């Protein structure tokens, strides 16, 4: 009976060691992919057009001025309201990785417009939406830490920079939070 606490302690230490090894192996397993994505984001962040102007503007959320996504507007809309984080929006989009692999697209659906709350998306996507008006069409580039981070999804590796062609079609649920 005196050996039971020692055995339990040993099991806990082994589980902790295996968990740490798994995290390290994921970090190491995707080392090249992580560097490729970071380099891609940096290259796009530093890219300029023929006039020497930035191709992408940095868009930061009000809650974290040190974080940002990149946005290049193709078409400016005629809307006057910006969606809030709690708003419901209608959008069309195509998402792909820095190697050109498409991981999602609304254009594969019968009705290409999808409706969801800004708050139900990855942080970078919500940042973009809350800085658009109806009719805006743009390309956004989201660094991995504002996307899925180290999460592994079926079509998206950990540490992936996400690129979207995005159009805000409507704001069917513009919600203003009421202060108590």
Which residues make up each language-model segment?
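C-terminal motif of bacterial Sec signal peptides marking the signal peptidase cleavage site
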Residues: 15-19
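Hydrophobic alpha-helical membrane-insertion segments
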Residues: 11-12, 152
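Cross-family detector of peptidyl-prolyl cis-trans isomerase
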Residues: 4-5, 20-180
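Sec-dependent signal peptide recognition
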Residues: 2-10
